[in-house]
Amino acid sequence: MSDACIYCKTAQRCPSDMIQAGPVALIRKLRWLYAPDPVMAGYALRTTCTSLLALGIALWMELGSPQWAALTVWMVAQGTRGRSLAKAKWHLFGMVVGVISGITLVAAIPQAPLMFILLLAVGIGTFCMIGTFMPGPASMTNYRIHGMRASGFTYAIVSLDGIADPHHIFAISMSRATYILLGIVLEASISGLFQLGLTKRTRHQLASTFEDTLKPALTAIAGILVGKEGAMQNVQAIFAQITTLGDQVEFAEVELGRHDHAGDHARAALADIAVLLARALDLATLMRLPLSQDDMFRQEAEAIRDMFLKLPARLEETESMASILADLLTLRRQCRQKVVSDFSTAQPDDAAREAVLRHGMLQQALVELIDALRMALTQFEASRHPGSHDHFHSPIRSYRDWQQAITNSLRSSVTVFGAGLIWICTAWPSGLTFIMFVCIVCSLFSTLERPALATQAFLRGACCAVVAAGILNLALMGKSTTFEMLGMWSGLAMMIGGLAFAYPPLTLPAVSYNLFLPILIGPSNQAKTDEIVYFNTALPLVLGLLYASWMYRVFLPYDPAHQRWTMREHILRDLHRIADGRAQETVDSVVSRNVDRFVRLMTNSGSTPSPVIQAYLTGILSGMRVMLNLLRLQAIRRDTRLNPEAGQALALIMGRMSHFSGRYHGHYGRTLRATKLAILRLRTCERNEDRPRERFVLIAALTSLDVIATELDTNRIFFDARSPYLDPSLTPAELESTG
């Protein structure tokens, strides 16, 4: 039976349900409007009142474009105090840079339109390039990048307004700076009135952030310890949560002030959870090897599992952190004692000696797992009770990608220059307004990895603003002559935008709506916005966003396959640098960089088939673990207790691994063979070694080498740089082998 027949029979049986399905679904989608979250409804009301106050003061001061004061309030206002202050600080910085740059541009090129457009485009591109280098993720919530965005569009509005009247550029720029500063000061001041008990609430939020991340991580590790299938299925969500919460720690630091280093400790604790997961993945790899598990290991694994599962409840209670750390230290000592007792027991044959070695490697992995958890808990305790003379610092890491920065810069510069050519060639009277909107869009979105999608959502919000402003200007406020009427109707429209901003699926369209609505309303002391002014503003707005969206799709568009290839090349190059000994990498830097790659790939996967994304995610995690074990081997090579023969074997594997240098010269096969040869030589060294300390060092080296060899073998297609990884020509069997 066809789908059409099934639909007809269903409609005949229950026609009322079919009719009501559409309206019910629509009503549920509008729940953000008629049943909003009370906290976010308060945010929308507070920001609306602040915006109207800024607009009223700007009108009272008789500023030339008072709508920018109201617009700035909506640009700076965020759901939390920390976000608002962080964004306000960087917005103010960007405004100062943009004003100075705009004055310089107009003063240098007052009567050369083509050169003016060229330098305007170069300036926007430069700000985008600098923004790409800012620490943190390339997202709309990164307010360091927002500082460069603010520089870009302030540079544009000052220079575009000033080029029409270059003799008064200083007065124009001071006017623009005044209403932007007015909006920032009002929003920061009024939002502070509603933040009672902020410090206590923020410290509680930092604690809950850590606990909410640690609990699923410990649950996954507990599954690994008992050999549960699919125990690490939710590791992707945990890494994404670590990245998101790590970004939010910065705003908690702003709310707490710079009196202590609680935020630094919280950021380090979240990073240690990522290290904990990496150690758990190493343990899972070793547990799959033959002769690795015995009854004693299973008993210890069960004891550690029980400890991990009970840990979240113990953190929520009043139990001291010292007792928890003492229990973990006891478990660690038991693992060490098990290895020492095996050292003192004579083994009857080589098979028994091999089994003892495997057990020792598992015990070493358990020790490293416990150490990672102890480090995370220590940092968590320091974030809850920071010391008075604490100088600990865990910075937000940034990874400069020159290729991405140049791409972002060219994309924005060419788009702005093209808009300028359209204005020069057509002599459009509203051409400067058109260029201004294009500059705003390029400044906001060119630092994102997928600007076309963001611009599309921005266009929808702008269209809603056009409709709302049309109703206000042409119908509701057509005859109003008082600020009270203006405030009543525009405040109602702004309130709707504030409620939409609090609803995640509508956040970006709501930003556009709140940004452009005051511009389209165009309040002024001298005149009202009639239909001519309204359409001459709305048309450049819509056309500017359409043009920018089109340019993002045709000029240097986002290519997910290229991003995956680039990530893979960088991972192979990092392996080369770490093995070569030239990279000044640490465990935290390796984990944070690869977790960032992991989350970026998940975020930007788009319509890519799930098996391809899953295989790349597995490859990134595998590469991260190989890097961590290479760092450990580098440390072991510097240990004076390592005998010369073992040191020579490690030097050989490092030399081979250093050939992972790019796309076409992988030397994968020789590297894998060298790794297995080094394992055999170190096993011989361990078999001939009687001193316990030296045997511990050899077992640690063998643990790392076994993990590296297993990862190289399991993810052959990812690490073999000569292969076209996940090319459409690959067979399903080859694709499955990558996972």
Curated annotation (Swiss-Prot):
GO terms for cellular component: plasma membrane. It is a multi-pass membrane protein. It comes from the Bacteria. One of its GO terms (molecular function) is transmembrane transporter activity. Pfam families: FUSC. It is found in: Cell membrane. Keywords: Cell membrane, Membrane, Transmembrane, Transmembrane helix, Transport. The keyword Manganese does not apply. The chain crosses the membrane at residues 53-73, 90-110, 114-134, 178-198, 421-441, 457-477, 491-511, 532-552. Its main location: membrane. Belongs to the aromatic acid exporter ArAE (TC 2.A.85) family. This is Uncharacterized transporter GOX0755. It comes from Gluconobacter oxydans (strain 621H) (Gluconobacter suboxydans).
